[in-house]
Amino acid sequence: MDLLVVGGGGREHAIIKKLKENPVVETIYALPGNGGIAADAVCVPQISATDIGAIVDFAVSHAVGFAVVAPDDPLALGCVDALHAAGIPCFGPDARAARIESSKVFAKDLMKKYHIPTAQYEVFDTSAAALAYLKTASFPPI
């Protein structure tokens, strides 16, 4: 089976190293990959991890049997959703679930709504509003 791993960081390299141990795996493609990953997978540096259309086209044209999407940006952009829609089984959260990592405001609002302990926070649209808030903050701002 041919696999696709989207990304080019250390996390993706570790995933590729473990996937290589499976005797069912024939070829692993890394989009875009990196110099270190090139020893363990076929890197495709001309396709960005955020070019969802190109990733899906590549996966379909190379008959990829399974994909792994790890970086935050492609997850937030819906890479898993698009691969699933194209019939490619995929490991990684869909865009809706990825919001908890890709949007700090969403994550903080979710924690507040469900009473999950988290540091105090406020959200601002302007730097002036943020500076005004800091003058009255009752906690040590970091």
Predicted regions and their residues:
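ATP-binding N-terminal substructure of ATP-dependent carboxylate-amine bond-forming enzymes
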Residues: 1-96, 128
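Active-site nucleotide/adenylate-binding loops and adjacent lid/helix of ATP-dependent enzymes
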Residues: 4-5, 101-142
